Amino acid sequence: MTSAVITSETKPWYLNRWSQLVLALIAMMSISSPQYVWTLFTGPLNAKLGTTLAELQWTFSLLIILQTWCSPLQAYLVDRFGPRLLISIGALMSGGGWVLSSYVDNVWALYLTYGVICGFGTGIIYVGLIGLMVRWFPDRRGLATGLAAAGYGFGAIFTSFPIDSMIKSSGYAHTLVVWGFIQGIIGILAAQGLRTPPDGWLPAGYSPAAASTAQAKRSYTPREMLQSPVFWLLFVMMSMMATSGLMVVSNVGPFANEYKVGQALVLGMAALPLSLTLSRLTNGLTRPFFGWVSDHIGREATMALAFSLECVAILILFAFIDRPALFVVLTGLVFFGWGEIFSLFPATLTDTFGSTYAATNYGFLYIAQGVGSILGGPAAAYLHQNTGSWTAVFIVVAFLDALTALLAITALRSMRQKHFAKG
C-alpha cells in the first residue's frame, strides 16, 4: 500500500468516495434488522422453543456482546484483509444466522445462530464500515460516520412492518429464511464495490493544515493508542454516554406505563409507539447532523453542545413526563442529544490517532458501547427497584451527560492539544 499523498478522486466510479459512502450506507441498512426487529420474534420463538422469556432474551444479549466486545478482532480482520472480503463475510454470517435460526429447536442452538453468528457478522460490518468512512472522508469525518451509523438505525424503518406482516401471515421460520437471504444478498452485493483508499490519500483541494478540526501528523498503531491517556479518556466518556443513553433507551416503555401516558392519544396515535417512532428517527438524524456540525466548529465543542442538550432534555422530560404530548416530543429530543456519540467519537478518535489503523483503533473504542449495554439497563432497573421510583435514574442520566460535556471542553480539549503538540 503506497504512502504517497493522492490529491485527486480515484476512479473507477465505485472508488469515488461518495459511492463508497452510498455502498456503506446500503450495507449498514442490511444489518439493522437482527437488533431492531428482534422483539417481533420473541413471542413466536418463545412459543416454539418452550423456554422462558428471560432465557430467550440471552439471545439478544449475545448479539450485542458479539457486536461490541469482539470489535477489536473484527476491525483488525477488516484492516488486515480489506473491506470487500470481510464485509461480504459479515453479510453472509448475518443473513446466514437468520436462515439457520429458522431451523433451531432449542434455545441453545438459537444462542449460536442468532446470537453468536449474527452478532459477529453484524459487528464486522459495523466497525469495518465506520473505520472505512473515516479514511475516505478526512475532511468530513463527522458527517460521513454519522451517515453510515444512521443507516444502521434507519434500515429497520423499512423492514419492521413487512417483517411483522410476514410473521403474522407465514410464520417466523419462513420470515427468517426470506429476510435472511434478502439482507445477506444486499450486504454481499454492496461489499463488492468497497475498497480502502491508499495510505495518505486526500481529496482534491483538501489540506489537513487548513482543516477546522485538528489532525494527527501520523498514524498510531493500536498498541501506541492504548498507551495514550487521550484514548482512555475517550473510552470513559463514551462509556458514560452509552450508559446514560441506554438507561433511557431500555426503559421508555416502563416510563410510559408508570406515568400512565403510554396509551394516551397524541395526533391520533398512542403516545408510546409514537414516541418510539420519533425517537428512532431523531436517533438517526442526529448522527450526521452533529457530525456535520463537528466538522465545522470542532469535536469538543460539539460534544459539549450535544451532551448538554441531552442533559437539559432529560431534566425537562422528568418534569413533564406525565403529559403525553411533551412525553413524545421530549423523548425524541433526548435521543437527538444521545445518538451522535456514534459519529463524534469515531471522528475524534481518527483525528487524534490517524487513519491507517482506523478500523482496529475504533474497534477498541467501540467496546465502550458494550460497557454501556451491560451497565445501562441493569443499573436503571436496580435504581428503580431499590428506590421505588425513576427519580434516581433521571438524576444519574443528567449527571453523566453534564459530566461528559464538561470533560469534553476541559480535559479532552487540553489533552488533545498536548497530544498534537508532541506530534
Q: Could you tell me what each predicted segment is?
A:
Residues 29, 97, 109-124, 239, ...:
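Hydrophobic core of transmembrane alpha-helices in multi-pass small-molecule transporters
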